[in-house]
């Protein structure tokens, strides 16, 4: 059984030239112009320190961003400044990742959902729009199931939770051990991989559709801050939890965003989420991999902002309507 069940295959390096003008650009406002130390905070959740970014203000509901496995808050660098122009935004390092301490108890998807809820409660955020990528989407959906009064809008970006439930556990665990060893490369080795186009393509082709088009600074930040301490226990937690039969319990407006060429989580999982969550809508970004918010940030930002800004109780066909190069 394949570890990566997607039918997508890596793009050739020269295909990057045809990726479109919105691929691999810096979004506006540019995150490089921000002193992020001014927005870094920490909170105590279950006796452990959790790091997060808190910025922006506005009349709209706050937006909370949840990263994927081996990720960190920097996964949202291309998105936070734009969202912060209109509302308060919070992006956390999940327990065991980035600048957050390891969790106090065994890692589980429901437990991570409770950690997200605890942070929202501590920050007195009220109802939020919750945005999660990959494992973060798994956690975001679980949070919406556990705490429906907290999540007013839900955005699942290449979310885990469907195909992973049917994978061979032993094979995936073996892959996880190999991934941890591969991820333990030194800062110098990582820098070499990022700066050399051919090597960058080889190392990051599973994550990004066109790695050589992603800005070097963005990859540096994501790679340098990625915490891998909790990788294996979190991977096992994902394998141990199946919430597919509970997805119909999600009642908030939900937008599903995917990359058509996602090599990590197959695009057909988006169809399953759409079928399972009442009233869910789906947007698929063409020629895009596992992290649409990094690969096509400007298109992603406007698509999601339009969705979460929709008046309460109103559902419009045009909200979440894809731009050129995006299908629904």
Regions found by a protein language model. Name each.
Residues 1-63, 85-87, 125-126, 309-328:
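Alpha/beta-hydrolase fold catalytic core
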Residues 132, 136, 140:
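Gly/Ala-rich beta-loop-alpha elbow adjacent to hydrolase catalytic centers
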Residues 250, 256-258, 262:
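Short beta-strand/loop motif that positions the catalytic acidic residue
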Residues 111-128:
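Conserved acidic catalytic loop of the alpha/beta-hydrolase fold
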Residues 145, 152-186:
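Flexible "cap/lid" loop of the alpha/beta hydrolase fold
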Residues 48, 53-99:
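Conserved HGGG/HGGXW glycine-rich cap/lid loop of the alpha/beta-hydrolase fold
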Residues 280-328:
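Catalytic active-site module of serine/aspartate enzymes centered on a nucleophile-bearing elbow/loop
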Residues 189-249:
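Conserved alpha/beta-hydrolase catalytic His-Asp/Glu region
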């Amino acid at each position: 059984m394949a570890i990566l069940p997607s039918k997508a295959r890596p793009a050739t390096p020269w295909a990057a030239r045809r990726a479109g003008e919105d691929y691999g650009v810096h979004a506006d406002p540019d995150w490089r112009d921000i002193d992020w130390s001014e927005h870094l905070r920490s909170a105590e959740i279950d006796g452990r320190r959790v790091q997060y970014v808190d910025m922006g203000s506005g009349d709209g509901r706050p937006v909370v961003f949840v990263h994927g496995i081996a990720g960190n808050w920097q996964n949202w660098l291309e998105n936070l400044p734009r969202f912060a122009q209109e509302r308060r935004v919070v992006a956390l390092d999940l327990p065991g990742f980035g600048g957050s301490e390891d969790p106090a108890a065994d890692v589980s998807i429901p437990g991570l959902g409770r950690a997200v809820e605890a942070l929202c409660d501590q920050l007195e955020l009220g109802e939020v729009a919750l945005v999660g990528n990959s494992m973060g989407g798994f956690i975001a959906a679980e949070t919406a199931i556990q705490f429906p009064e907290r999540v007013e809008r839900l955005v699942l970006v290449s979310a885990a939770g469907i195909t992973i439930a049917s994978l061979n556990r032993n094979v995936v665990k073996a892959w996880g051990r190999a991934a941890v060893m591969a991820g333990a490369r030194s800062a110098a080795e990582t820098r070499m991989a990022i700066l050399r186009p051919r090597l960058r393509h080889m190392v990051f082709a599973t994550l990004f559709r066109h790695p050589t088009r992603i800005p070097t600074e963005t990859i540096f930040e994501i790679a340098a801050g990625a915490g891998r301490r909790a990788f294996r226990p979190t991977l096992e937690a994902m394998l141990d939890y199946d919430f597919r039969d509970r997805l119909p319990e999600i009642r908030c407006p939900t937008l599903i965003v995917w990359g058509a060429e996602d090599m990590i989580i197959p695009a057909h999982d988006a169809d399953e989420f759409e079928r399972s969550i009442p009233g869910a809508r789906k947007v698929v970004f063409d020629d895009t991999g596992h992290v649409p918010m990094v690969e096509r940030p400007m298109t992603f930002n406007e698509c999601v902002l339009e969705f979460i800004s929709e008046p309460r109780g109103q559902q419009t066909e045009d909200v979440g309507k894809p731009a050129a190069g995006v299908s629904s």
